[in-house]
Amino acid sequence: MQLADAEKWMKEFYEKRGWTEYGPFIRVGFLMEEAGELARAVRAYEIGRDRPDEKESSRAEQKQELIEEMGDVIGNIAILADMYGVSLEDVMKAHQEKLTKRFEHA
């Protein structure tokens, strides 16, 4: 899926459910929640969970969880960017330019 197609799909999906009605402060809260879930998935994948109240998962299940949580983070970033009239393409271009400039003499 191309970035622009993903943005369009996410916007339509979130709008259909009324999830775009939340303001940016609430959206950032959702983003932080999803970032925490991604951190948990990374931990499970890298060092395991060691929790007796959780079932063990296979490496494939752990990787799928990583992918899904990354998607949740990106989805929230895309919706937040859209609130400010910014595309993910714009975000990535600016990020690339910033890093290139910062490290051009390194």
UniProtKB/Swiss-Prot annotation:
It comes from the Bacteria. InterPro entries: MazG-like_dom (IPR004518), MazG-related_YvdC (IPR011411), YpjD/YvdC (IPR047046). Gene3D superfamilies: MazG-like. PANTHER family: IG HYPOTHETICAL 16995, NUCLEOTIDE PYROPHOSPHOHYDROLASE. This is Uncharacterized protein YvdC. It comes from Bacillus subtilis (strain 168). The lineage of its organism: Bacteria, Bacillati, Bacillota, Bacilli, Bacillales.
